[in-house]
Amino acid sequence: MNCYLILTVALLLTSAMTGTTTAGQLNKKGVTLREDDRFPCNPGGCACRPLDSYSYTCQSPSSSTANCEGNECVSEADW
C-alpha cells in the first residue's frame, strides 16, 4: 500500500514541477487558452469562443459575434 502512496505523490510532484496546465494561460486580451498560445485560425480570420463551449471556432471578422463570449471575435493581431 505504501508503494501506491509513494507513486501517487511522485506523479503529483512531477506534474507540479513541470508546470503543465490544461488551461489558465492568458493572452493580451485576457482570453483563457486551452492548450497553448498559438492563434487557432487562418490569417484573416478571427477566433470566437461560443457561449456554450470551451473551444474556439474560426469565422470571418464580418460575421456576427452575438454567440461569442463577450460579443467579441478576437483577431490574430489581438491574440
Curated annotation (Swiss-Prot):
It comes from Californiconus californicus (California cone). Residues 24-37 form a propeptide. The keyword Secreted applies. One of its GO terms (cellular component) is extracellular region. Residues 1-23 form the signal peptide. Disulfide bonds join C41-C58, C46-C68, C48-C73. Its main location: secreted. This is Conotoxin Cl9.4. Expressed by the venom duct. The lineage of its organism: Eukaryota, Metazoa, Spiralia, Lophotrochozoa, Mollusca. Keywords: Disulfide bond, Neurotoxin, Secreted, Signal, Toxin.
